[in-house]
Amino acid sequence: MTLKNKTILVTGSEGFTGKVLLSLLKNNGAKVFSTGLSQKVDKFYYQCDLANEKCVINMIEEINPDEIYHLAGSFSNDFYIDLESNLITTRNILESVYKLRKKSRILLIGSSAEYGSIKHGDNPISELHSLNPTSMYGLTKIFQTYLMKLYVELHGLDVVMARVFNLNGKGISDKLFIGNLYKQIKDLKSNKIKEILLGNINNERDYISVNNAVIAYIKIMKNGITGEIYNVGSGKPEKIECVLNQILKEEEISKNVVKTNCKPNMKYDVKTIFANINKLKKLG
């Protein structure tokens, strides 16, 4: 894989996945610009509030990117926060590329939360499965999906989407199960807490390493068909308890300090969900 002569913009570059993507793109010869809210001196970094359309227009006009990876977003489940982070920022990027008449190819990050409540027999879930969100986060991601389709169909923008299942890796946001587990392990080792409190660990999810997910993003950016959505996952279910045991073993933590079912069950807690990744595999 070579990306020489490519100018690429990555949003959400200060997140764990963004850092992994930045490193891989740079190592393959791309000229990579990143953006975030923090202040730092770097000619390849732009401090920009993506919810501010003027800021986004100025940034894209100056960088003139061949490709844009839009990784920035939130999963707070607060409607207004997620609406701004997941929808308004996306709209500003798409609108800026349209207004500036840029030819940038854009990759958006969707979520398996868009599928929401499913039946066990529906697995593996394909991109054609109905969307039944059970969270504000999932709902705003569906809005993002339809926004993509609108800009592709009405304005001819070159946009593709990676619909991501569960990411696995040290450094992931502590709002996700694995990130929260690592945070509690860190607190346990520093004697801030005496035990690790978790919810239901009997459900099955589709976990993919951050490294493999990022490779899939690049593949979709390179070979994906404009306007199409591609599931990104391992394509197989894994019991949350197995993931827990693996991490505890790696961190040399006894399972005796773990207390489960300490958090209220969600009304629409899905027992098993995993991706059909045949469409992604066809990209090579």
Predicted region positions:
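Conserved Rossmann-fold NAD(P)-dependent oxidoreductase catalytic core, especially the SDR/UDP-sugar
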Residues: 70, 92-135
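NAD(P)-dependent short-chain dehydrogenase/reductase
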Residues: 118-120, 146-205, 210-218, 237, ...
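C-terminal "lid/loop" region of Rossmann-like NAD(P)-dependent oxidoreductases
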Residues: 196, 200, 229-230, 238-245, ...
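Active-site helix of classical SDR
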Residues: 136-143
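N-terminal Rossmann NAD(P)H-binding glycine-rich loop of SDR-like oxidoreductase domains
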Residues: 8-27
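NAD(P)H-binding glycine-rich loop region in Rossmannoid oxidoreductase-like domains
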Residues: 50-86
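SDR active-site strand-loop-helix element
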Residues: 11, 35, 68-72, 106-112, ...
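Rossmann-fold cofactor-recognition segment
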Residues: 39-52
